């Protein structure tokens, strides 16, 4: 696919980073990383994926959601965005060294993994429809573009077999070493542990965990204060030291909620504390539509 040149340096760079981490230790990850992730695909008025990447604000954009799977049907909901241009937009983002992930799950109820076989079937579809599998006869909604990784946003249903799905997806790294690697991330609720994702996360195959410190009054800053956030943050970072843990923030106050952290409190109180973690990874914003309205990310970017 396009951006092979971009990926060609990933292997040698990974080797350098691995050596560096052995020499310097995980403490090198503490403090600002400059990494900011945003979710895209939940509102047609947020603009195109290309426009999102052209803002220069984000280092990763997560397409949401691949929301129908597990029962022989596979489909996504991108809120009316034109599928015909998304493939080209993915390549455009990748050409700017912005990673594009596909998030599976979401708020709908049309997904689950009733058996280990269904997990294998879903992994097969994701690999061939959205990544570098490209088996003939498998519909590719984004054409020949391949996403950089898969995000697990399992917010509904039973927790069964998501660990199997993670293992099946990750196994493609051994089967196709010369191709685009399968990178796994998870987006979880802030209260530790997230019961739907615990078994999957315990596989230790997830390089990032985006923890949503919103939508839950027990651990969102505006409701629970710094102590409420840190009580959960410290559990996430301690339990998964091999994963980069991202601070998930609401880019606006959704009607009926008060989860958007005021800029001054974010800068002086929240970020200095979460960035003490050795495996702090960056900031995740929900979502592009709200960020476009408020401009929250334009300020937060420099503190991530």
From Swiss-Prot:
It comes from the Eukaryota. PROSITE patterns: GH18_2 (PS51910). SUPFAM superfamilies: (Trans)glycosidases. Pfam families: Glyco_hydro_18. GO terms for molecular function: enzyme inhibitor activity. CDD domains: GH18_hevamine_XipI_class_III. Keywords: Disulfide bond, Plant defense, Secreted, Signal. Residues 34-304 form the GH18 domain. GO terms for cellular component: extracellular region. One of its GO terms (biological process) is carbohydrate metabolic process. It is found in: Secreted. Disulfide bonds join 53-93, 190-219. Belongs to the glycosyl hydrolase 18 family. Xylanase inhibitor subfamily. Fungal xylanase inhibitor. Possesses competitive inhibiting activity against fungal endo-1,4-beta-D-xylanases belonging to glycoside hydrolase family 11 (GH11). May function in plant defense against secreted fungal pathogen xylanases. Is similar to class III chitinases, but does not exhibit chitinase activity. This is Xylanase inhibitor protein 1.
């Amino acid at each position: 696919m396009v951006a092979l040149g971009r990926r060609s340096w990933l292997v040698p760079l990974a080797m350098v980073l691995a050596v560096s981490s052995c020499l310097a230790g995980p403490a090198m990850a503490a403090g600002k990383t400059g990494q900011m992730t945003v979710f895209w695909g939940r509102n047609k008025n947020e603009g195109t994926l290309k426009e999102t990447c052209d803002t220069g604000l984000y280092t990763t954009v997560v397409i949401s959601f691949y929301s129908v799977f597990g029962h022989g049907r596979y489909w996504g909901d991108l809120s009316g965005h034109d599928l015909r241009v998304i493939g080209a937009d993915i390549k455009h983002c990748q050409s700017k060294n912005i990673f594009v992930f596909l998030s599976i799950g979401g708020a709908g109820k049309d997904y689950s993994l009733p058996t280990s076989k269904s997990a294998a079937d879903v992994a097969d579809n994701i690999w061939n429809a959205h990544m570098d599998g490209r088996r003939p006869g498998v519909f590719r909604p984004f054409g020949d573009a391949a996403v950089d990784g898969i995000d697990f946003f399992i917010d509904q249903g039973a927790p069964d077999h998501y660990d199997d799905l993670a293992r099946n997806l990750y196994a493609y790294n051994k089967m196709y070493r010369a191709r685009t690697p399968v990178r796994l991330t998870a987006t979880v609720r802030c209260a530790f542990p997230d019961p739907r994702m615990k078994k999957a996360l315990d596989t230790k195959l997830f390089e990032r965990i985006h923890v949503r410190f919103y939508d839950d009054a027990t651990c969102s800053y505006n409701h629970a204060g710094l102590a409420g956030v840190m009580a959960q943050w410290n559990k996430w970072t301690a339990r998964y030291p091999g994963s980069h843990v991202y601070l998930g923030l609401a880019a606006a106050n959704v009607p009926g909620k008060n989860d958007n952290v005021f800029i001054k409190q974010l800068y002086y109180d929240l970020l200095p504390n979460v960035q003490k973690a050795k495996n702090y990874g960056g900031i995740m914003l929900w979502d592009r539509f709200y960020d476009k309205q408020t401009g929250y990310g334009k300020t937060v970017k420099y503190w991530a």
